[in-house]
Amino acid sequence: MLLNGDCPESLKKEAAAAEPPRENGLDEAGPGDETTGQEVIVIQDTGFSVKILAPGIEPFSLQVSPQEMVQEIHQVLMDREDTCHRTCFSLHLDGNVLDHFSELRSVEGLQEGSVLRVVEEPYTVREARIHVRHVRDLLKSLDPSDAFNGVDCNSLSFLSVFTDGDLGDSGKRKKGLEMDPIDCTPPEYILPGSRERPLCPLQPQNRDWKPLQCLKVLTMSGWNPPPGNRKMHGDLMYLFVITAEDRQVSITASTRGFYLNQSTAYHFNPKPASPRFLSHSLVELLNQISPTFKKNFAVLQKKRVQRHPFERIATPFQVYSWTAPQAEHAMDCVRAEDAYTSRLGYEEHIPGQTRDWNEELQTTRELPRKNLPERLLRERAIFKVHSDFTAAATRGAMAVIDGNVMAINPSEETKMQMFIWNNIFFSLGFDVRDHYKDFGGDVAAYVAPTNDLNGVRTYNAVDVEGLYTLGTVVVDYRGYRVTAQSIIPGILERDQEQSVIYGSIDFGKTVVSHPRYLELLERTSRPLKILRHQVLNDRDEEVELCSSVECKGIIGNDGRHYILDLLRTFPPDLNFLPVPGEELPEECARAGFPRAHRHKLCCLRQELVDAFVEHRYLLFMKLAALQLMQQNASQLETPSSLENGGPSSLESKSEDPPGQEAGSEEEGSSASGLAKVKELAETIAADDGTDPRSREVIRNACKAVGSISSTAFDIRFNPDIFSPGVRFPESCQDEVRDQKQLLKDAAAFLLSCQIPGLVKDCMEHAVLPVDGATLAEVMRQRGINMRYLGKVLELVLRSPARHQLDHVFKIGIGELITRSAKHIFKTYLQGVELSGLSAAISHFLNCFLSSYPNPVAHLPADELVSKKRNKRRKNRPPGAADNTAWAVMTPQELWKNICQEAKNYFDFDLECETVDQAVETYGLQKITLLREISLKTGIQVLLKEYSFDSRHKPAFTEEDVLNIFPVVKHVNPKASDAFHFFQSGQAKVQQGFLKEGCELINEALNLFNNVYGAMHVETCACLRLLARLHYIMGDYAEALSNQQKAVLMSERVMGTEHPNTIQEYMHLALYCFASSQLSTALSLLYRARYLMLLVFGEDHPEMALLDNNIGLVLHGVMEYDLSLRFLENALAVSTKYHGPKALKVALSHHLVARVYESKAEFRSALQHEKEGYTIYKTQLGEDHEKTKESSEYLKCLTQQAVALQRTMNEIYRNGSSANIPPLKFTAPSMASVLEQLNVINGILFIPLSQKDLENLKAEVARRHQLQEASRNRDRAEEPMATEPAPAGAPGDLGSQPPAAKDPSPSVQG
């Protein structure tokens, strides 16, 4: 298995089959710079083919690229079906050995048609181990156990179960005939109105998973290592094998290859046994001695190479599954060996064994970045080292908590212990030496690592040359929080007091500064909005800082300038920090703030700071414009446009961020007034600052919005304001007062703008959260911390259109309950010994979710043993408290604690005392709550049907808890050039230039693959958009291929039931239908509906879209009754969430009417179409095309109804003998069904004349130039720390309706 985004070239080639084989770059002006038209330089990368001669098989051709390394051809051969059993070989060209690490273009004489000979090389111990590991990987290549166990970056995918393999030409294509009989019956549990929520269908058993047994046992022999005399005969190691025929054999791995020896389990005899067959490959030897192996191994490899490459490639970060079927534990020599060595990734392949993580992390940052190829190389190296470091840190953190690592201070109390393992430093999230005594003790110590990680993430994103941060990973495991950090060279040899040359080690009592640090941090202060400021130290001397006092600067022995302890990078959140004598604005007081939180490290999010500054910039422009209007009351100057010259005095923000309210009430709300204000703002922007009146205007506006400069808009925050123990000089009192006011305004802005804005967006379906994670994501995108969840829910409750926010309220309550339960679970687990873990977790789940009134915890059997022995065990792992207090918890007590926690932490009153009351009051589902708590805590449960509602027995037993995984937080390094390409492509698509957009997004895909390898969330978003574009441009096959990759990738990197995966399934179903693969389309839609039911339930706006899709496809295959069930459900849901007069509801009525027409039930059809017609007439007017279409259809229905009635009357008059031609009911054509599917999925093909098109493009280009002028100004002046992901950009969690994702003139949202 390949680790952490590594990908053999063969898989890359398959994975990138849709992409052109080239690598494109940008001009030096900077990525995505569209002002002069994006100049794309093509790096010539024409491939050529070489002939491969390998022993024992026919020669074959291989397409290669000059930029590939020789090593990548090795990897291709190790993956091919006919050469996969070889690992120890070299490639020869004209008798010369090719170097592993040289690029093909540098190999002399290598050209089109060259012959490369595969030559078997002698083994070493290392090569023999690699060979055995590779054979084991081949034998396990279809076995999903590594994915269920969450190891080696394996993860699950179930798409192939629903598509019968590949959807491309190679796979089993569905018949294209429209009227082919196909099985359309959905399972009972996914029908609208079904109360059943089974868990087993979540992970259907793939036919390939019942593995073909090639061998019973392959393991290292107990006779290892070979004695000295045998080493001198070339013996490297011994293997023990039991074949499928039950033959036990002992095998010698020697320098020349593998052969049978005469040893038995108890008798060592290394001499060769008969048949005397020496094979260079272990597989060839096993083929000789076991007919079953020979037959099954061949079948296994055939199946392996038939699987889609995206099902096999390792993901960059480990994804864990919260459920797993019961699996047999098979013997596995490689797994056993890995468990007892500190192998991380492929450690033993690297000289020097353990890696110097700090050196690797910092060296990759120092790589050059002047042009695109350099930046790609740098970003790929950063990403690779980072994913490796995260894997190593996670493994180390688990080893620390499990007690398998010796502490560096073993004599101290468990909580105070620190650890070093594999060159990584580990500390536990407890308040050691009362460091956080004034900030909330252990609670503050638990929160500090995540704040610090956010700081590291931010400084890494700003990426200032010469400033270094530590590799940081935060791991929550078994109730403990472990921080893993790379080690600054020399830090362990010195006291902290000596090391720190900038900042404070005691929260501001002693403070030092350093000119070099001030210079470096000054460069970050602009994008991070941090104010350079003075504080007083313990000797009352003024010290200048450009960060919070806790931020420490240490110069390592390597001469690098490191910053650490970045927990206060962002300003404090005053809503949760009561300060005696300070009053908050009225908006805060009205909402019940300030509220004392359990710690004093509450900070505003970076997104909030950015949104606040943007809001202030708008206010600044409006104030300045209003003053100009007053000055120019007599005569108005002609405004010059923003394009002509960038603003010299106004910086940083785009002209008109959507959705931001104006802060000033004075200006008129009429459109003409706003237009005037905008013109005047542009006048100021174009002014060069010489006009004294403009200077005066700008000075006044700067003062009003709190800018630190009087000549330019520049808002920054002092992160030390309101920090306990930090004092400011007398001379700065005015500045401090202004800064305090700014912080109060920011706190008020969060409550008065951001939270109402979020609720409004949810109401208008601009965002569609589906589960707790997507709700948290949309809150964070707006800078709203999760501690405000109670306030969000209160606002939803008070909203006039409360029922239209039912889905948000339900998700929010579920999130509030599971987060409160997680807080309790964390402390609960800390008191559990390792031997009691499954009993304790199953007891907690019973108390949390089971209706059984008094579950009894099963104490582990060894609790009954005398405890004298325990007195000797002073230094236990952190979890070994010998505490059975957990066993006495009751459901009543747990739910009382959950309600208390909800009140204390979120300030929300839950109206439930048991799980059943919670389900009844808030419409929650127990299976959804189980999923949410499992994902948040790392629990893995057995895949089976749980009887949550049984009052006679508890839902969970010890055997149902299979595992507990770590929950890992880490930095996500970005592929910046690829991201800019992606944004430029989106912009082109939105302007209607689909082909150009498609090319740019293809480029982005190439670059994403270059940096991240084949698997990544952002690559997934790229593939989704590419598929949509190909679909719009009529290339269904390409759309299908890209969307299949997007689904597989979403399953693998985000989770098989993640809301994004559900959306990807829906898109794929549409493209399958368009390609006449009807039964596959239905299978995919049924899967999406099942996942939606499991993750949320029935009553969600997204369910209306899903049911419309299902209903339409069923209508197309003439399953009218089934179709009506789904379409009528969609109509009910749409009516609830969009209101009875919405256009979506009119469309829903029309779809239902069409099915009734097909059933010849004209009265019902007329009734629904009339409803639709009324809505169109009211909303759009009688002359609108839609209204006219509906009117025509009504006439048509009326005529059919009259004709039917006439026929019926004829029958009544003349009896059955009447000679009446049979009524003709035609099935809907596939084209008409597809047309409706496109409409509901937000894809409209608008017929435009050439003139219309030209006018539209001219208008779009004009607007785009204005936007670009503003954007380029931002980019030139302010290298932003992080870009907010645009709709549908990488990072988008699928929380928006498809319509909002890819709008364009030809793709109407």
From Swiss-Prot:
GO biological process terms on file: intracellular distribution of mitochondria; mitochondrion organization
Gene3D superfamilies given in the database record: Hypothetical protein (hspc210), Tetratricopeptide repeat domain
CDD domains reported for this sequence: CLU-central
Classification lineage: Eukaryota, Metazoa, Chordata, Craniata, Vertebrata
Species this chain originates from: Homo sapiens (Human)
Listed Low complexity bias regions: 1279-1290
Similarity comment: Belongs to the CLU family.
Domain Clu: 335-577
Compositional bias per record (Basic and acidic residues), positions renumbered to this chain: 9-25, 1264-1278
Family annotation (Pfam families): CLU, CLU_N, eIF3_p135, TPR_12
Phosphoserine, modified sites: 279, 281, 654, 664, 723
UniProt feature, compositional bias: Polar residues: 636-651
TPR repeats, residue ranges: 978-1011, 1020-1053, 1104-1137, 1146-1179
Places the protein is found: Cytoplasm; Cytoplasmic granule
GO MF annotation list: mRNA binding
Protein name: Clustered mitochondria protein homolog
Record carries keyword Transport: no
